Design a protein with these regions (language model features):
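Nucleotide-activated donor-binding/catalytic signature segment of Leloir-type glycosyltransferases, i.e.
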Residues: 235, 241-260
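A charged, aromatic-enriched C-terminal amphipathic alpha-helix characteristic of glycosyltransferases
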Residues: 317, 330-363
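Short hydrophobic beta-strand element within catalytic cores of glycosyltransferases
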Residues: 285, 294-298, 313
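A short, active-site helix/loop in glycosyltransferases that binds the activated sugar's phosphate group
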Residues: 121-164, 172-176
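Aromatic "clamp/platform" in nucleotide-sugar-dependent glycosyltransferases that forms part
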Residues: 277
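A short helix/loop element that forms part of the nucleotide-sugar donor recognition site in Leloir-type
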Residues: 127-130, 177-191
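Conserved donor-binding/catalytic core segment of Leloir-type glycosyltransferases
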Residues: 5, 191-209, 215, 219
């Protein structure tokens, strides 16, 4: 089976890229071949295909004209098309529409995974008509949370009638996330063994990540713990003057910069922060739970779905609760073991290949090309 997975960008540390990489591995575990196609790649594979029109050449600019010939060829030469958020955002609506048009023309079974429907974020481009997110009932639409499922069902009930709308929570590599090197990563960051490291995996230019709120929590925790607390923002970019820069200037023991392996990030951290105002899912919450680290997150609405799966997440207002946990080794072990067990039960990538095969079959049924 030849699969083409398309996204705006691939290979980065952002949530969509990480989730897309998991699906690529899942398809390949089935013995299927996967071609990655994107407007921009942060890494490289030999068979990658750049699709003009999906990604702007300069920040803030409009995307270049859509490369219809390449999109048509990809649709005609693959057995399954996966649009991973490429049909969800207003960042490149003409490319999204072209992907849907050529997929329908070629009759290729298509899975459209929606991480961030356009109305849930900042409107980047004007869109006329009912175009984005894509919602054709001959394609299988996979949303990553129940919240978005209800929104899609209300807007396009025909998707329910066609059985073309499903929920699949993003999975994580539970075993891989437990392989981080705590000592080596902390040494590279310049963190002493007795310091409390708060890791915040976030982009400095993403307002929803609430960096000022994360710094406020770090300062409050530093005020009640006896040892030194350090705040680690993984994005090294300087950012613009304003509230974020002002907050970072007050961050305790500030550290900036990525590490290549997520497992090392979580191994190094004592607490993971994600006090976002909005997340489509919040992958670091689940990754931290899988890695056995306490996570402080919210109050974004979808977090309730992660908690409902049995994952304990601390509220940013509960500084005392986090401080007490860090001071009680027995409670720390018990709660975090329960968190890891909840992730293993419901959100492990071990089950992903079989789930992807099922999604592919459902997409074939919608297209009328059952094998």
């Amino acid at each position: 089976v030849r699969v083409c997975l398309v996204s705006h960008r691939l290979g980065g540390f952002d949530g969509v890229s990480v989730a897309a990489a998991a699906w690529v591995r899942g398809f390949r575990a089935l013995g299927w071949t996967v071609t990655r196609a994107a407007g921009f790649f942060a890494d490289h594979e030999p068979d990658d295909v750049v699709v003009r029109g999906l990604w702007a050449d300069r920040p803030g600019a409009a995307p270049p004209p859509v490369d219809h010939a390449t999109i048509s060829r990809l649709c005609r030469t693959h057995d399954l098309l996966v649009l991973d958020n490429a049909g969800s955002l207003w960042s490149a609506p003409l490319a999204s529409r072209a992907l849907e048009h050529h997929a329908l023309a070629a009759g290729v079974p298509t899975v459209v995974r929606h991480h961030d429907p356009a109305w849930q974020g900042v409107v980047l481009r004007p869109v006329e008509g009912d175009v984005v997110p894509l919602h054709h009932p001959r394609h299988l639409h996979v949303v990553i949370n129940r919240y978005t499922e209800s929104e899609f069902a209300a807007r396009w009930p025909e998707l329910l009638d066609a059985k073309a709308l499903v929920v699949r929570h993003p999975e994580v590599d539970v075993d891989g996330l437990a392989t981080g090197d705590r000592d080596a990563c902390r040494t590279a960051l310049g963190v002493d063994p007795d310091e409390v490291l708060l890791a915040h995996p976030a982009r400095v230019d993403a307002a929803n990540k609430n960096i000022p709120g994360a710094v406020s929590f770090a300062r409050a925790l530093a005020a009640v713990l006896p040892g030194r607390v350090r705040y680690w923002l993984t994005d090294p970019q300087p950012g613009e003057p304003g509230p974020v820069a002002d907050a970072l200037a007050q961050a305790p023991g500030l550290i900036r910069g990525w590490v290549p392996r997520p497992a090392d990030l979580y191994a190094a951290a004592d607490v993971v922060l994600l006090p976002s105002t909005w997340e489509g899912w919040g992958l670091p919450v689940v990754e931290a739970a899988a890695a056995g680290k306490p996570v402080v997150a919210g109050p974004y609405p979808v977090l309730a779905e992660i908690r409902a799966l049995g994952v304990t997440v601390w509220d940013p207002e509960d500084v005392g609760g986090v401080a007490a946990l860090l001071s009680d080794p027995d409670a720390h072990r018990a709660v975090l073991a329960a968190n890891r067990a909840a992730v293993v039960a419901s959100l492990s990538q071990a089950d992903l290949p079989a789930a992807l095969a099922d999604l592919a079959e459902r997409a074939r049924e919608l297209t009328g090309t059952v094998q």
